[in-house]
């Protein structure tokens, strides 16, 4: 069982590092081509951020291997989901607007500055980054992705990621969160089937729920996370 845990964590780590490495590569390519000082400064910030993200991932997963437990609730604190979402969206836009013409929009449906949840900041960042990476992977060039933050009648905060991609082929969308499950169309290349499983595990860690569906009004997918009251 210990070997199985180690293998699972190692596989997850490889998958998680691949995302910031892709971002590093893209940012470095754009940095090499652009002469715009403001854009170069922003790209350098993204490079530094991704390096820190890789370092954090290695540290976190090493600790998980040692302890064979996820993160304890003692490490959680009250954090502003909107600020975290804005930071991740800005980083992704800096890369993918230039590289593929994909625009990510952050919509605050209640026009609030603060959406507090009880959680671990870098893990919430990881959730949003993985969802955006998944949407981008399924989207054609020059498409839009929306990140929506809302609060329901029970004062629970809702985070949604909606894209204009291929949507889910699977009618039972709960399966998409299974480890190694992939419903990616063949023309979208090889896919490990780990990204959404990692998201699901992190969502569970925060006592939140996650659901996926196809957009009814238009083509694309919709992933919704509901966080408990902080």
Predicted feature residues:
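Short conserved segment of the HATPase_c
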Residues: 168-180
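Short alpha-helical Gxxx[C/S/T] motif in the catalytic ATP-binding
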Residues: 195, 199
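Conserved micro-motifs of the catalytic ATP-binding
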Residues: 69-74, 114-119
């Amino acid at each position: 069982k210990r070997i199985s845990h180690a293998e699972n964590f190692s596989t997850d780590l490889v998958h998680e590092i691949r995302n910031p490495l892709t971002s590093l590569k893209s940012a470095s390519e754009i940095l090499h081509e652009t002469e715009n000082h403001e854009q170069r400064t922003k790209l350098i910030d993204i490079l530094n951020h991704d390096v820190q993200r890789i370092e954090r991932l290695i540290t976190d997963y090493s600790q998980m291997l040692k302890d064979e437990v996820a993160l304890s609730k003692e490490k959680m604190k009250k954090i502003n989901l909107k600020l975290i979402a804005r930071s991740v969206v800005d980083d992704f836009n800096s890369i993918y607007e230039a590289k593929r013409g994909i625009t990510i929009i952050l919509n605050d449906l209640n026009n609030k500055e603060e959406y507090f949840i009880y959680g671990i900041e870098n893990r919430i960042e990881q959730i949003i980054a993985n969802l955006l990476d998944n949407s981008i992977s399924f989207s054609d060039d020059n498409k839009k992705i929306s990140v929506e933050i809302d609060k329901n009648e029970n004062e629970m905060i809702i985070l949604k990621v909606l894209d204009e991609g291929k949507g889910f082929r699977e009618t039972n969308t709960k399966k998409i969160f299974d480890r190694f499950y992939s419903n990616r169309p063949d023309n979208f290349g090889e896919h490990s089937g780990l990204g959404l499983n990692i998201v699901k595990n992190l969502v569970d860690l925060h006592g939140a729920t996650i659901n996926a569906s196809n957009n009814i009004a238009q083509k694309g997918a919709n992933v919704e996370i509901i966080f408990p009251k902080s």
